[in-house]
From Swiss-Prot:
One of the primary rRNA binding proteins, it binds specifically to the 5'-end of 16S ribosomal RNA. Residues 1-22 are annotated as: Disordered. The keyword Ribosomal protein applies. Part of the 30S ribosomal subunit. Keywords: Ribonucleoprotein, Ribosomal protein, RNA-binding, rRNA-binding. This is Small ribosomal subunit protein uS17. PANTHER family: 40S RIBOSOMAL PROTEIN S11 FAMILY MEMBER (PTHR10744), SMALL RIBOSOMAL SUBUNIT PROTEIN US17M (PTHR10744:SF1). Transmembrane segments: none annotated. GO terms for biological process: translation. It comes from Chlorobium luteolum (strain DSM 273 / BCRC 81028 / 2530) (Pelodictyon luteolum). It holds the Pfam family Ribosomal_S17.
Length: 94
């Protein structure tokens, strides 16, 4: 079974989560912090509000900058806080 592909193994394990968010920090080497916003409804008052999650992601080529809109996907833990990696830069900051 040495000829099995890694894509086939990854598909068998299930889909990986992906998020789209804005880069809020790029001061580290090969790492960025991405702020992902989502809308949540209050359980009692039914009003919608925004919640922000800050994800640390691996940026191998240091290509993402502050304010860029990026797509990240989950991966194996790379450090204590970093378990996502940069997939693509959707839109560069102006």
């Amino acid at each position: 079974m040495a000829s099995s592909s890694t894509e086939g193994q990854a598909a068998a394990r299930g889909r990986k989560k992906s998020w789209t968010g804005k880069v809020v920090s790029d001061s580290m080497d090969k790492a960025i912090i991405v702020a992902v916003e989502r809308r949540v409804q209050h359980p009692v008052y039914k009003k919608y509000f925004k919640k922000t999650t800050r994800l640390m992601a691996h940026d191998e080529k240091n290509e993402a900058g502050m304010g860029d809109l990026v797509k990240v996907v989950e991966c194996r833990p790379l450090s204590k806080r970093k378990s996502c990696r940069l997939v693509e830069i959707v839109e560069k900051a102006k």
